[in-house]
Amino acid sequence: MGYELPASLGIRLAGATGEVYAFIGDGTYLMNPSELATAVQEGLKVTVLVMDNHGYQVIRRLQLATVGHSFGNEFRTRDSSMALEGDYLAIDFCKNAESMGARAWHVETEEELRRALAEARAETRPCLVHVEIEKHHFGPPSEVWWDVAPAEVTDDAETRRLRESYEQGRARQRYYG
């Protein structure tokens, strides 16, 4: 996470011909949007596809599954109780990209996506295609065990239950070496 956009610049710097794409989430983009400015500065034609689910939703899902709670994974305002459960932030990724000299499209349909990609291929400068996707929809489960430890000491019953499950997973973990 955070590697894709800089890596796409490296591919272009290595002399790649043809199109170079970075397929990233909104969270990854916000980690290093300055790389897009570098692409413009250096004349490196890359196309960045930003899948916008309003946060680090995969991390949120992992936290919910392993520790029973998530914190700060969604790009939201605080609600009246000061929890991060308010409105989702209206981040304009296209304006951000355009402010750095890239060409940008916001697409909502397959037809718009195809058209944006065709137009991006014709461009000589860096491009960004913004696609808003479902916030909490994921593919099929991977059935893998993640070594993410819930707190050992807690008053929260759900976290205690998940800690027991974690310890069972650790007992089954195999080490190679």
Predicted features along the sequence, with ranges:
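Thiamine diphosphate
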Residues: 1-177
